């Protein structure tokens, strides 16, 4: 590892989130400025740095010094001190005041700021208020640098220093030494493994309660990232014991204490095997979200609708004595100029008499055209209809298909970070019906927020394909609603003629039915199978398809094409494919760091 002493002349780029910095610095005996990269959060123009790292040649950017460790030393010359102070480092001191201060105190300037701040009143134009600003800012910088040194000494990226200081202020070092695992709870981006690395260097016992507690929380969070709302107790104990290298008996004792402290919630649930009941362990946020979703759906289904269609059907049923009476679908078909099969017609009739209903089916089975019929039925009675979907693209497709405005769920709920959703139980949505498309993409937390904003007199129609990939967040909400058997569900199964011309759709259904897809290649098809044994050849083929063949054949610009790969690393992984595609499609563009 090489040691390099330099003076920062220019900061080219700095990511305040992770601290990654690109800067230009002056180094003695180097004629030109050198490029330095690394986690150099909170350095400033004029900073004198002692770096440890190695030189690396980047094809695009040339020779760079990659700093792995660094510490800041104070500038010793009048010029260096003036540049350092005037860089924006100290609140209340710009280039003008930096010059005045240095002219007054010379090389003693930093000592005066550190030990005799009141002497700054001798500088023309500096009063009590500015002196206090300088004092506070100087102390803040010192604390952040102390946090950085602590993290560096414990092998942790210094990019967390500013986040830690923002959370704990002047108590940062004490907090980290007292319980480094608290950072995993309090600071986004700092996880159990980072905190555990610090704790081990500080001498924390492997079976310390704070360590076991943090490891259990980390295990549950990882399971949530995989889509699970809870973990069965036996599964959680085994996974946590493996992670923590601890006895299962210690995990059980810690788990019991966490449940007693309400850090976690334990619920007895039915299990699908011969075992009648199992204990499920929840993070509180997921428990209350799941309970909220179940409770609100039940209340919605039981409460009468407040709209004209509902009351018209209630009156008609009372007059005729026919409790299964619904609307006349033939009139709806005339309105939308469409002929529905019996299952689609049943969906429209069920939607007319239901408070909560699910419409599901695979691609090409007519979910969109059926939704159009449901909307036409509601509109014929003057109902106010709200449309929404989880993503902007899905909302746009919904608007194009129905002619009505559809919003993303976040926009519908008027999400305003950091305050949250403006639409909620105290400020509910205004309408008679809410129809949500692509519901398989909605996770438990979002569904709970959505349902909170629905008044109990409103109808809810959920549309989606349960065989699509589930939501990114925890919870398989649409499938769970269907499997509950509590709410009316209409499954569309017929693949319509227009969809039968799509091999993608036909193969999707084949796979879903456990059949091998048709991988033969031919003209006028939207599905091709190209086999490449060599990974490098596969990358070249993907680049050729995206750059030339697909845009030309389908009249689609390359930036409307998405490449999916099941892996992050490797020659055909996402990281390498992104580089290859950027080089071919956007060679002059700036790379994006994750």
Could you describe each region identified by the protein language model?
Residues 316-321, 466-594:
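Conserved helicase motor core of P-loop NTPases
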Residues 21-33, 413, 573-587:
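Short, basic/aromatic beta-hairpin or loop at an interaction surface
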Residues 1, 5, 46, 78, ...:
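Amphipathic alpha-helical transducer elements in NTP-driven molecular machines
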Residues 311-317, 321, 325-336:
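Conserved adenine-nucleotide phosphate-binding loops and their immediately adjacent elements
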Residues 115-116, 123-124, 217, 335, ...:
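Charge-dense polyanion-binding interfaces
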Residues 1-309, 313-317:
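Accessory, non-ATPase domains that flank or precede helicase/AAA+ motor cores in DNA-metabolism machines
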Residues 345-348, 353-522:
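ASCE P-loop NTPase helicase motor core
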Residues 327-356:
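Conserved pre-motif I regulatory segment
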